């Protein structure tokens, strides 16, 4: 058994805010992104080019893309819409943790019930990792992406590594 921990670098992270009651804006943004904006709390959708659109709140989403031009494309296409597009790529990083016992390991640092809150392939949750705000995104395989501010990356990474030392494999 193993736990694999690695940083996922160089992905674009774009914050999108808009009025969810503005059907024209929601429809246009969904068309631009190639997938519907998730309206159900703690879910995400994925488009044909594997960009994730993650629900952060009723009027806020995080788009994750490996396209370096994703921000400018979205900004230009939403220019005439009542939408706010912000590049937050330099603010956040992603730690991917993979393995059979990741829920057991992460439960040492979270009060969130992962079995309940990350039960489907398109689920996500915002919570505290010890005292650090994080976004947890379940992947389609046995992995969870932990989105956190860059300044907390080493702290979280070191806690996870320390936490593996007394797992009973």
Which stretches of residues belong to each language-model region?
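Basic, glycine/lysine-rich polyanion-binding surfaces/domains
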Residues: 1-169
């Amino acid at each position: 058994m193993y736990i694999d921990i690695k940083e996922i670098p160089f992905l674009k992270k774009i914050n999108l805010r808009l009025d969810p009651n503005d059907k024209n804006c929601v429809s246009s943004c969904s068309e631009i992104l190639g997938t519907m904006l998730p309206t159900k709390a703690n879910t995400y959708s994925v488009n044909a080019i594997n960009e994730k659109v993650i629900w952060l709140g009723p009027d806020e989403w995080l788009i994750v893309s490996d396209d370096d031009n994703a921000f400018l494309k979205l900004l230009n296409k939403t220019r005439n819409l009542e939408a706010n597009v912000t590049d937050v790529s330099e603010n956040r990083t992603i730690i991917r943790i993979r393995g059979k016992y990741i829920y057991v390991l992460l439960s040492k640092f979270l009060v969130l019930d992962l079995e309940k809150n990350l039960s489907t392939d398109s689920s996500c949750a915002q919570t505290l990792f010890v005292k650090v705000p994080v976004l947890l995104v379940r992947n389609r395989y046995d992995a969870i992406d932990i989105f956190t501010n860059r300044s907390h990356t080493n702290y979280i990474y070191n806690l996870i590594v320390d936490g593996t030392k007394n797992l009973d494999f």
